[in-house]
Amino acid sequence: GAARVKELVEEEKHSLSGTFRLGVLPTVAPYLLPRFFPRLRKEHPETDLRVVELKTKEICQALREGILDAAILVRLPETEGYVQTPLYYEQFVVYVSRGEALFDRTSIRTSDLEGEPLWLLDEGHCFRDQLVKFCHLPAAREAQKTYTLGSIETFMRMVEGGQGVTFIPELALEQLTVEQKELVRPFALPIPTRQVVLLTTGDFVRHSLRDLL
């Protein structure tokens, strides 16, 4: 992710002045932005980067209406029709509290999640939608074993407090402490993954800014 961003930065370094409005998914922003935003501010102070966190549907609408210049989100059917610059692939991992039976497993199968108290994002988040589909979680929702709140970070705090199971993206692992990493369990094969891309419209002309990101 960060290496790809750096590679794009080296391609063009002109026409970087002015305001650039970037939409980012809430499940991507906390883990990707800290990797390049400080360097961008230091090396290109003339670039006024405005970042807003939005869900996929909101981002696509804002791009169509010209409210955003570009967006960082996950490649989905909804993103087809836009100019897509691949940034990176990443896996999902399971975050398990010490009080759950799954904590003793070295890897997690999707069938292991049935009946578990899962912390999931609200509907409309592609992060949730991908995992619900991959892990066959509707049955868990119907059994009222799945609860919803607002952010991955909130769910992580709940798990660390001894409550339930949640999912986090691979890029988040770099920010975890040794103690937090003890709660991480990989999925058994097949492993759910996502592709993070930079999205722009076909008439986007500030290519230097796009390449910078």
Where do the model's predicted regions map?
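Alpha-helical linker/hinge and terminal dimerization helices associated
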Residues: 1-13, 213
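Flexible hinge/capping segments at coil-to-helix
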Residues: 13, 79-118, 202, 210
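Central regulatory/effector-binding core of bacterial HTH transcription factors
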Residues: 17-80, 141, 148-151
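Hydrophobic residues within well-ordered alpha-helices
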Residues: 22, 62-64, 113, 157-163, ...
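A late-sequence structural motif
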Residues: 32, 183-213
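Alpha-to-beta junction loops
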Residues: 47, 63-72, 92, 159-165, ...
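Short beta-strand->loop
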Residues: 83-93, 166, 170-173, 178-193
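Secondary-structure junction motif
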Residues: 117-138, 206-208
